[in-house]
């Protein structure tokens, strides 16, 4: 029997990462924030003083990437996120990282992956898919508060503008644009607490887990 796979997609700061971590912990599944794979490649390039359009170097770093040593605290800087969004437009890099992500879902007993193309490209046959949304003002406020909690300066208007640009780039890129899978459950977290979003997701996941266990 194949491991159970939960795919979670959505735009930046929609709450998908927090939800994915909580779901993975609850069901004792493995979790992968696929955005960190692109951030890791971007970070490696920036550390070497290279630009994000250096495809040869980006491909080399993607090939060397070890999913077991991704460090969220090191990779959560805003500038790395912006660079990662550009890295994600390089077809050869996406191909390499998607292959690594697909290997990850083979690990039992199951996994939760969050990103922007999980349900559509990485795991089209996932047992259940979610597409997480929230209005852009709520998302900007969340990102603003996240940055402040890290003790860094934050500019709400700049964050709002950056999110709009990020959405445009993610949704219109040629390779794996951000969009909901046709069979994904839409979950709007604009007015939901993390506990409410988690409860809503579990209501849909639980019957599938129980059905799998009964086989």
UniProtKB/Swiss-Prot annotation:
Catalytic activity: CMP + ATP = CDP + ADP; dCMP + ATP = dCDP + ADP
Alphabetized InterPro entries for the sequence: Cytidylate_kin, Cytidylate_kinase_dom, P-loop_NTPase
Key word Ribonucleoprotein present: no
One Pfam entry name: Cytidylate_kin
Gene Ontology molecular functions: ATP binding; CMP kinase activity; dCMP kinase activity
GO cellular component, one term: cytoplasm
Binding site for ATP: 10-18
GO biological process: pyrimidine nucleotide metabolic process
EC code(s) of this entry: 2.7.4.25
Keywords on record: ATP-binding, Cytoplasm, Kinase, Nucleotide-binding, Transferase
Places the protein is found: Cytoplasm
First-level EC class: transferase
Protein family (similarity comment): Belongs to the cytidylate kinase family. Type 1 subfamily.
Protein name: Cytidylate kinase
Organism per entry: Bartonella bacilliformis (strain ATCC 35685 / KC583 / Herrer 020/F12,63)
């Amino acid at each position: 029997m194949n491991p159970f796979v939960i795919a979670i997609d959505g735009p930046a700061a929609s709450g998908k990462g927090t939800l994915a971590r909580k779901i993975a912990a609850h069901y004792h599944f493995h979790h992968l924030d696929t955005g960190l794979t692109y951030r890791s490649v971007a970070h490696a390039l920036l550390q070497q003083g290279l630009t994000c359009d250096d495809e040869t170097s980006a491909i080399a770093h993607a090939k060397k990437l070890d999913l077991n040593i991704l460090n969220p605290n090191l990779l959560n800087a805003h500038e790395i996120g912006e660079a990662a969004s550009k890295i994600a437009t390089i077809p050869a890099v996406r191909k390499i990282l998607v292959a690594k992500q697909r290997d990850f879902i083979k690990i039992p007993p199951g996994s939760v992956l969050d990103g922007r193309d999980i349900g559509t490209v990485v795991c089209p046959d996932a047992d259940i898919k979610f597409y997480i949304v929230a209005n852009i003002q709520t998302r900007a406020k969340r990102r603003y508060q996240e940055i402040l909690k890290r003790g860094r300066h934050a500019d709400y208007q700049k964050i709002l503008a950056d999110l709009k640009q990020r959405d445009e780039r993610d949704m219109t890129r040629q390779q794996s644009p951000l969009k909901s899978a046709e069979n994904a459950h839409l979950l709007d977290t604009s007015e939901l607490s993390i506990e409410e979003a988690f409860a809503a997701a579990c209501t849909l996941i639980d019957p599938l887990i129980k059905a799998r266990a009964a086989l």
